[in-house]
Amino acid sequence: DVLPMAGEYVAAVLQEGIAKFVEGTQPAGVDTSTVVDTVARISGYKAKAAELLGEPVPPRPPGFCVGCPERPVFSAMKLVEQETGPFHVSADIGCHTFSTLPPFNMGNTVLGYGLGLASSTGVGPNFGNRVVSIMGDGGFWHNGLTTGVANAIFNKDDSVLMIFNNGYTSATGAQHIPSTGTNARLEPTGQDIVSALKGVGVKWIKRVRTYHVSEMRKVLGDAMTTKEGGLKVIIADGECMLAVQRKKKPVDRKAVADGDRVVRSRFGVDEACCTGDHSCVRLSGCPSLTIKSSGDPLKSDPVAHVDEGCVACGLCGENAHAATLCPSFYRADVVQNPTAFDRMVERWRRRYISWLG
């Protein structure tokens, strides 16, 4: 019994398990002291940190990555719930399973990979409104198209299916799937989700960019309230942010090194405008959107703050607009290797600001 039967196999758990295994087996001719000493040293660091902090380090709950394209969809779903009332959400296996945790708490059932729609068909008749099923593009090709969509059409199911089209099986390492566009050998493929849906008889299909929260809110609201029966499918398009960053960062680094103009966007919060009610935090759950002291003795509540991990996905601003929150978010563009025109514009901006006093 060197590893726990339940829980996540994080590095610390694996280190302790390996140390127990090595200690218990004592392989001949192998010095096991290094492994045991390493684990003991790390445990000592943790104990020392807890002592200095005065309290245990707070747990880090699992959640969506910074800039994840799936987070905005659940922000939109929370806004739709305010209009239609609570509805059953049949969750699925994938990154989107994190929606079952705070701050969204959306996902009443999780049956299996690609089985979100199949499970909702069984419970749907027990509710007074339409149920929403969640499915990733990986789950769609794995099981969802046949077990879920085809059977929903066959059984005249009147519900809503949300398909996250992020381009990969992201939760397990961004493996290619039929709709990625290429296979593992980077050979072009001709399969796409819309054609597959139409092929099994789906009539109501909408596509929305995931980061467009207001548009997603409207389309999902229409799907929940339309008098048209049958399965209604919303394809939420947004490439996995980890994949985007893996491609973008090397290109930007090379461009900067070559002396080319590179613009990097960042979002922030105007502390003077922030009201301190933190609705923006509760509506997005972005790890980069946190709080800090206002520094104003007349404003006791902490204000929202965007930290250095921001990838400029724009969700904070989209949520503020869609939910009519305070207008405290702003976007700033950081220009590396600016041109002569950039420098001239910046000089005029500074001069104009000084004139305003």
Label every model-predicted segment.
Residues D31-G116, N126:
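Active-site diphosphate/adenylate-binding microenvironment
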Residues D1-E8, P58, G63-E70, M106-Y113, ...:
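Hydrophobic alpha-helical scaffolding
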Residues D1-P61, W204, V213, R217-L220, ...:
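Peripheral docking tails and interdomain loops at the edges
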Residues T100-V233, M241-R246:
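Thiamine diphosphate
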Residues V13, G238-E239, V244-Q245, P250-V251, ...:
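Iron-sulfur cluster-binding cysteine motifs and their immediate structural context
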Residues F64, P72-V73, H96-T100, G139-N143, ...:
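Flexible loop/turn segments at secondary-structure boundaries
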Residues D258-D270, A322-G357:
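Intrinsic disorder at enzyme termini
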Residues V36-K78, L242-D258, V262-C286, D307-G314:
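Charge-patterned, long linear interaction tracts outside catalytic cores
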